[in-house]
Each structure stands twice: as C-alpha cells, then as structure tokens.
Swiss-Prot record:
Belongs to the UPF0758 family. YicR subfamily. PROSITE patterns: MPN, UPF0758. The keyword Transcription regulation does not apply. It holds the Pfam family RadC. GO terms for biological process: proteolysis. Gene3D superfamilies: Cytidine Deaminase, domain 2. One of its GO terms (molecular function) is metallopeptidase activity. Zn(2+) binds at residues 171, 173, 184. NCBIfam families: PRK00024.1, radc. It comes from the Bacteria. This is UPF0758 protein YicR. Residues 100-222 form the MPN domain. PANTHER family: DNA REPAIR PROTEIN RADC (PTHR30471), UPF0758 PROTEIN YEES-RELATED (PTHR30471:SF3).
Length: 222
C-alpha cells in the first residue's frame, strides 16, 4: 500500500506538469511500479540509478550486473529491457512513418537506439531519396567485437535497387569508444568514391560508442 501511495507523487506531477517534468528517478519509478520489501519504489529507483550511473547505464546493462543489486530480480530486469526495446522500436517506426528531412540530432538518436549495446560491430546504411527523405534503413554487414567487413559494391547495389539518391553510413564500436579508426576512414573514402560513379551522395558516417558518437560530417571529413 505504501508503494502505491509513493507512486502517486510522480503520477500527479506528470498529470499537472507533463511527463518531461519528472526527474529520472520519478520516471523510472513509474515503470517499476512497486518497490521491494522494506524499500519503496522511489528509493529503489534512486538506488538503481546510483548503482548504474545513469538511465543509459541502466538500460544497456546485462542481467549479471542486475543480479548483484539487492532487491532487483529477473522481473525488474525484464521490465527495463522492455523499456529499452520499446524505445528502439519507436525510433524505428518514427524513421519510417515521419521520414522528414533528417536533422543530425534525430539521425544520431535513431542510430544510438539501433546500435547501442550490440556486442559485435554492425554496419548500417540509411537510404534517402533526392529530397533526403528516408526510404529505408538496413543492417548490411555484421562482424566481430572490433571489426566488420564492408563491401561498397553491396551498398551501391542496394541503393540502386530502391532508387536511393543519398546515404548515411553508420556503425558501432562495442568497445565504447566512438573515435574512428584508420580503417573506418579508409572504408568511408572507398564508399564515397564508389558512390560518386553512380551519382550517389554520402551525407555522413556516424560511429556510435557507449554514450558518445562521432560524425564524419561534423568533423569536416565528408
């Protein structure tokens, strides 16, 4: 009963001021709904964020890390993984249905939702039309912990198939550091040169790390 009373506070705050007015602790408490024995839901939410450092650290953690926190079991872990997956699917649908002229921020958020937490390097391409509206996106290549083999010819073939005019390249670094390697720069140059022959523009190559990213366009490399 105490947990339910405590939970009314963030709910009432949300109804009065909007969901964005909630703190990270209050927002997490809404999803958790109940606390544990001797610990109300707000206290539990606060302790979880302190243990994992942030919402990002919490939602990208693995069950082994959860099992070391008192009062957090498989049910809470499943709830939080469900939240993370819901966010990922939301961005997926948003990209398909809104398909506006992409802002750098929206592109980055979408790619982070798709690639963060992957244990292997994944190379993605967002395909756009002549107005830079999204046609589709695809995970074209999958590799190992620190390498992914990328074939420009396959990228061009896919672009021609769907009549794309521009591309945004992206891949993740499971190590967490988003700084591009020499190999990343070389393959980007190869893709750009190959695309030029087919009148395809490469707008950016974004590398996703753990809580950070690097944009080739922002660095002036494209």
């Amino acid at each position: 009963m105490k947990n339910n009373v405590q939970l009314l506070m963030p709910r009432e705050k949300m109804l009065k001021f909007g969901i964005s007015a909630l703190t990270d602790v209050e927002l997490l408490a809404l999803f958790l709904r109940t606390g544990t024995r001797g610990k109300d839901v707000l206290t539990l939410a606060k302790e979880m964020l302190e243990n994992f450092g942030s919402l990002y650290g919490l939602l990208t953690s693995e069950y082994e890390q959860f099992s070391g926190v008192h009062g957090i079991g498989v049910a809470k872990f499943a709830q939080l993984k469900g939240i993370a997956e819901l966010a990922r699917r939301y961005y997926n649908v948003r990209m398909r249905e809104e398909s506006p002229l992409l802002s750098p921020e929206m592109t980055r958020e979408f790619l982070q939702s798709q690639l963060t937490g992957e244990e292997r390097e994944i190379f993605m391409v967002i395909f756009l039309d002549s107005q830079h509206r999204v046609i589709t996106h695809s995970r074209l290549f999958s590799g190992t912990l620190n390498h992914v083999e990328v074939h420009p010819r396959e990228i061009i073939r896919e672009a021609i198939k769907i009549n794309a005019s521009a591309l945004i390249l992206a891949h993740n670094h499971p190590s967490g550091c988003a700084e591009p390697s020499k190999a990343d720069k070389l393959i980007t140059e190869r893709i750009i040169k190959s695309c030029q022959f087919m009148d395809l523009r490469v707008l950016d190559h974004i590398v996703i790390g753990r809580g950070e990213y690097v944009s080739f366009a922002e660095r002036g490399w494209i």
